[in-house]
Structure formats: structure tokens, C-alpha cells
Curated annotation (Swiss-Prot):
Protein source organism: Shewanella sediminis (strain HAW-EB3)
Family: Belongs to the UPF0597 family.
Annotated Pfam families: SDH_alpha
Entry-linked InterPro entries: Ser_deHydtase-like_asu (IPR005130), UPF0597 (IPR021144)
Single GO MF annotation: L-cysteine desulfhydrase activity
Full protein name: UPF0597 protein Ssed_2537
Domain of life according to the entry: Bacteria
Amino acid sequence: MKHQWQQYQAILNAVVKPALGCTEPICAAYASAIAASMLTSEPESVSVHVSDNLYKNSMGVFVPGTGKIGLAIAAAVGAIGGNAEAGLEVLATIEADQVERAQAMIDAGNVSVSRTQTDEFIYCYVKAHSGDDVVTVEISGGHTQVVEKTLNGEIVFAKEVSATTSTAGICDGVDISIAGIYDYATQVSFEDIRFILDASELNTKLSAEGLANEYGLQVGRTIDKSIKDGFMSSDFANNILMHTAAASDARMGGASLPAMSNYGSGNQGIAATLPVVMTATHYQANDELLARALIMSHLGAIYIKSHYPPLSAFCGNTVTSAAAAMAMVYLAGGSYQQSCFAIQNVMSDCSGMVCDGAKSTCAMKVKTSTGSAVNAFMLAIQSTAAQAQGIVADDVEHTIRNIGQLVTLGMGNTDTTIIDIMSA
């Protein structure tokens, strides 16, 4: 395999992984589980300090297996029942009595949550004590990237700053572009990318769960009912919207099923996966074609998002759906140029959508961006593309750089304002 392709696969392996529950509160649960594993008995108290952006994305989302919302329950149940070896699936095996004990710890005033000033967008510091022992766990630069652990004031683990790999810089030093991603996805050995089919399996199960049960705003179930009631047609576009939104409903509603995440986001993993899976079904594509399309979608999304900070004020589902549209064109037999048209079309459509935290209404944003992907795909296969106007440039790479500039230089104050509004 080419060195460049090996780098691409390493990127995918690093940030396309199963995650149970919204990754921001799960980050706190993971840190707490590690802290608890360092103690000889169950923690008596837990304090959590997080970055503004991690705080924002934890305020309104259900923690799986608990039926409850927020960082406090995530940290408490992580400390009492979390599996420190399970990464983003830290809460996969929690039980009802552990949730009750976690809530009792909160009710007793032994769990605290606060914001802390830091340059890192993804940052979580947990302090736990039991008896005479006090432990701390610090996560920085990635949802599971532990950079320091202490026991009774002594450092027992530390990762040098120069050795840390922040997800924000995951494409740094890599020869990567939309053209390179397209070539990799269409030419690499199927056996080297077969693993991405797990995304189809996990996120399809999550969609089925969201359609079968009541989660969040029930966006997917509402589309399903509207189709059955004759208000909407059962067609290619609406079925994609229904299944994609339903998975997000379940994800945000605390379903105890993992999503295959993308770049730290389960919703974006859903948006990168299900429109592609549904398109593959429509065109009766085999597993190899589906895998190639999923690689195109997931890696394309990662590449575009690497141009701006994670957990910013910009809703990442927008650019994720742009990459999904690119992959949909591929499955329809379109050309590379038409795939680029699809990206341009999405970028011109809904690239102004803001992130105001993870919550049940994310399912509506997933539906919106996915709808944009479907429209962009339909235009692109007719060789229709947005022209060089506004933030959309003559070529797709220039447009992607423009998006990065918009978010990095133009939306910092937006992010601060959103967090201030949410915290008021």
C-alpha cells in the first residue's frame, strides 16, 4: 500500500470508531472511570472541569443507560460503573443500581461541574477522592486522549505535549485532498477497507432503534408517520431523511446502542453513513462499492473538518453531508467532477448552520444537512454545480479553505456568544 494511503487508513482508524452516547459527556464519563480505577474503593466525590465547548455539547443530551441529561450524571455513573478499558463505550455495561448510586452521589452534593479556561476545545479534568486517596485525570486534544494522571499529588502518567496528537491536527503533514481521497477510495484493495462496513451495521441498527421507539423529538418517526398518513411520499429522498434522522433521534435520546462516530461525533458518523447506505441500497451496490463510498464519505468529512477547530460554532453536519453527497454521486456512477459538484452544492446551501450544543434538536439539523446532501447529489448527477459566488470558489479545494477561514477567523465570537446565552 502507498505510504499516502497508509496515512489515510491511520486517520480513519484514529477517528472513525464506535461511540456509545454523545462523545462530550462520554469524555467526562471516561475520565471518571479511569479515576475510579486508580482508587482502591468507590469514589466518594467527583469534580469535573471542562472546556467551554465540551460544556456546550454536554448540557442538553441524554447519557445512555441513565435516562438523564448532563455532565454530572455522566461523570458520576462513569466513576461508579464505567469500564475504563472501553474508551468511548465506557458506559456500555452500566446497570440500573449503578445509575441510582450515581444519582445519590449527585443528590448528596458530591459531584460538581464547572467550566475552565483553556486553549483546547476538547478538555476535561476530573478529580476524585476515596478515603485518604485523591486522583486526577486530565484529557486534552481528543475525547479519549489522557495526558496526565496523578495519585495523591504524584504524577503516575504523563504524555509529553509534543507527543500528543490533537484531533484538530490529524491531517497535518499528510498529502491529502479531495482528489487523493477519491483515488484512495476507488483504488485501494477492498480487504484494506472492509472494516468501514461496520459503520453501516452500527448506524443502521441505531436507525431501526430510533424508528421503533420514542427518542427525543422523534424526527424520523414523524417522517415515517407522515408517509403513512399520506402527507409525504415514500421515495428515495424521504427514506434517506427518515432513516438518518431516526438514528440521530436515538443517539441524542440516550439509546444504549453505539454509533460509528466520525471525528469525535456520533451524529456526524450517522450523517456520513446512512445516506450512503440508503443510496447503495437504491442502486443495489455490493459490499465493495458500499465500502468504497463509505471511505469516501468518512475520510472526506474528516479532511474538510480538519480545516477548522473541533467543537466550534459551526455545525459539522454540514460538511459531513457534503462528503456524503460526494459518495452518493460515486454510487450512482457519476464522475469525479460530478462528485466535486456535489460538495460545492452542499457548501453553497447550508454552510451557515451553527452549533448550539448537543441535544435532541440535533436530529433536525442532521435532517437539514442530509436533505442538502440529497439535493446536491441530484443536481450533481445532472452536472449542475454552484458557481463561484459567496464563499464557494471555482474549485472544491479553495471552497474548503474558505470554510476553514470562515469558521476559524469569523466564528470565534459566535461561539462565545452561544455559550454565554446557554449558560445564562
